[in-house]
């Protein structure tokens, strides 16, 4: 089996990621490619963020949910190294054709990738 087939087979289904008529090419790519990869990488993403949080907030476990939420928002919006790490752990699972599409739409897709990851981390706040 070649790399492309393997990468695509690894991706879980995301029932909420609908493909409907009239959606943009970027939104279709997000739903067909990005969301399944993020779902596949979920445990890795949460572990990565947990390590990040504990590195910056030694008392992470005792912080209020409000302070944790603020830290998550702040980290995913302003910490360029963290954002680049998240983006890298997603685009590493792209096929060459998907990577070419990504490079053509890099700015918008980076924004969407980080936004989806931020929402996923916020929804798993109690697991971190």
Regions found by a protein language model. Name each.
Residues 60-110:
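Amphipathic protein-protein interaction modules
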Residues 1-35:
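N-terminal leader/targeting peptides and immediately adjacent processing regions
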Residues 9, 16-20, 56-57, 61-62, ...:
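Short, flexible segments with low predicted structural confidence
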């Amino acid at each position: 089996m070649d790399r492309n087939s393997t990468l695509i087979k690894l991706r879980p289904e995301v029932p909420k990621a609908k493909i409907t008529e009239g959606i943009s090419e970027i939104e279709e790519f997000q739903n067909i490619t990005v969301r399944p990869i993020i779902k596949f990488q979920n445990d890795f993403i949460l572990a990565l963020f947990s390590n990040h949080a504990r590195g910056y907030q030694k008392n992470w476990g005792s912080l209020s949910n409000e302070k944790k939420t603020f830290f998550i928002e702040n980290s995913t919006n302003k910490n360029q190294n963290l954002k680049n790490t998240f983006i890298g752990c997603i685009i590493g699972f792209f096929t060459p054709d998907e990577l070419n599409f990504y490079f053509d739409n890099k700015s918008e897709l980076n924004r969407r990738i980080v936004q989806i990851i931020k929402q996923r981390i916020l929804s798993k706040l109690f697991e971190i």
